[in-house]
Amino acid sequence: MTAFHNKSVLVLGGSRGIGAAIVRRFVADGASVVFSYSGSPEAAERLAAETGSTAVQADSADRDAVISLVRDSGPLDVLVVNAGIALFGDALEQDSDAVDRLFRINIHAPYHASVEA
């Protein structure tokens, strides 16, 4: 039995790359895993089928979606905030909507998810 056997894990941003590796590892260690995805439903469906985890579409830029996801996931033992975006180029030339989205995903989502958990 592993340290995460029968533990409940939520991974924000878990459908690809590092997030998918996190999901796979927690499942391998016996956890019940729910993960969110935003823009890659095919990858999310494949990962859920492969691992027996649960994929939920939720935009981390949407505060209400993040809060609902945490609430709907039930009592959590582990919260992993993997969702994040980056902007490239001159900071003074960035579109203000893109900067707002970056802050909603990278700063606000972790805050709201942590408070709700």
What is each model feature region?
Residues 83-88:
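Conserved NAD(P)H cofactor-binding loop of Rossmann-fold oxidoreductase domains
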Residues 31-45:
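Conserved glycine-rich Rossmann-like NAD(P)H-binding loop of the short-chain dehydrogenase/reductase
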Residues 57-68, 96:
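The beta1-alpha1 cofactor-binding region of Rossmann-like NAD(H)/NADP(H)-dependent oxidoreductases
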Residues 90-91, 95-103:
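Substrate-binding pocket helix/loop in short-chain dehydrogenase/reductase
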Residues 15-16:
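Conserved glycine-rich cofactor-binding loop
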Residues 1-10:
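Flexible N-terminal pre-Rossmann segment of NAD(P)-dependent oxidoreductases
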Residues 114-115:
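A short, exposed helix-loop element centered on a Lys and neighboring polar residues
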